[in-house]
Curated annotation (Swiss-Prot):
Cofactor notes: Binds 1 Ca(2+) ion per subunit.
Cross-referenced Gene3D superfamilies: Trypsin-like serine proteases
Entry's family note: Belongs to the peptidase S1 family. Elastase subfamily.
The protein's Enzyme Commission number: 3.4.21.36
Record-given protein name: Chymotrypsin-like elastase family member 1
A biological process term (GO) from this entry: pancreas morphogenesis
Entry comment describing in which tissues the protein is expressed: Pancreas.
InterPro entries from the UniProt entry: Peptidase_S1_Elastase_sf, Peptidase_S1_PA, Peptidase_S1_PA_chymotrypsin, Peptidase_S1A, Trypsin_dom, TRYPSIN_HIS, TRYPSIN_SER
Any one of the GO CC terms: extracellular space
Protein residues bound to Ca(2+): D85, N87, Q90, E95
Positions annotated as propeptide: 17-26
Length: 266
């Protein structure tokens, strides 16, 4: 159930079956963060039996709304979000547990065609989050903002710490500078798999997203402020941390109008 798209569908786009996107991301090559370093980060969890399990990340964008990846909520399951969490396996005393009341997936999302984009969803919570030093709203970029190449960014999440490894118990972060579209869409990188509605970051072969990071934020520093410019979407099927295969994110600035309309109409 851990999600981070592995691009299994890339063969449909002229790629060999040995290198395709995978949608189950976690932070590889990262470090544990101190508590409340990224207070807009949430853990999206699904219920199985009487227990809850982490499946994806997400960002609190309104007191009753969370932004995540569409592929995280494809299945018909019962979800909740955990805000203010740090260690998934213990009670930090700062958590807020809120049920997901409604899931709004982008209408153009197609789980059989990840390369088309639209890997974004917003979740309406059953009650409003209480904002404090551990739970804050994420800052979204202005509509249409394009990151300059090598913009400082951090991915955060509880995803696997290495390809085929275990989930992290404490929240991790990894420095992933942005890779501009011209570079990321070149033949030696992702080629035509990457679209202008996506953001690439990393690709050094050391640090990356991995299974369990999906849906979580890419925090980028622009004009002195960190904003959530990406929603973690997919990595290469060859592994999470493959050189010249940056982690790929949904570009939040391409969907600001959709986000606002989805919230207003739901």
């Amino acid at each position: 159930m851990l999600r981070l798209l592995v691009f299994t569908s890339l063969v449909l786009y002229g790629h060999s079956t040995q290198d395709f996107p995978e949608t189950n991301a976690r932070v590889v090559g990262g470090t544990a963060v101190s508590k409340n370093s990224w207070p807009s980060q949430i853990s999206l969890q699904y219920k199985s039996g009487s227990s809850w399990y982490h499946t994806c990340g997400g960002t609190l964008i309104k007191q009753k709304w969370v932004m995540t990846a569409a592929h995280c909520v494809d299945s018909q399951m019962t979800f909740r979000v955990v805000l203010g969490d740090h260690n998934l396996s213990q009670n930090d005393g700062t958590e807020q547990y809120i049920s997901v009341q409604k899931i709004v997936v982008h209408p153009s999302w197609n789980s059989n065609n990840v390369a088309a984009g639209y890997d974004i969803a917003v979740l309406r919570l059953a009650q409003s989050a209480t904002l404090n030093s551990y739970v804050q709203l994420g800052v979204l970029p202005q509509s249409g903002t394009i990151l300059a190449n090598n913009t400082p960014c951090y991915i955060t999440g509880w995803g696997r710490t290495k390809t085929n490894g275990q989930l992290a118990q404490t929240l991790q972060q990894a420095y992933l500078p942005s890779v501009d579209y011209a570079t990321c869409s070149s033949s030696s990188y992702w080629g035509s798999t990457v679209k202008t509605t996506m953001v690439c970051a990393g690709g050094d072969g050391v640090r990356a997203g991995c299974q369990g990071d999906s849906g979580g934020p890419l925090h980028c520093l622009v004009n002195g402020q960190y904003a959530v410019h990406g929603v973690t979407s997919f990595v290469s099927s060859l592994g999470c941390n493959v050189s010249k295969k940056p982690t790929v994110f949904t570009r939040v600035s391409a969907y600001i109008s959709w986000i606002n309309n989805a919230i207003a109409s739901n």
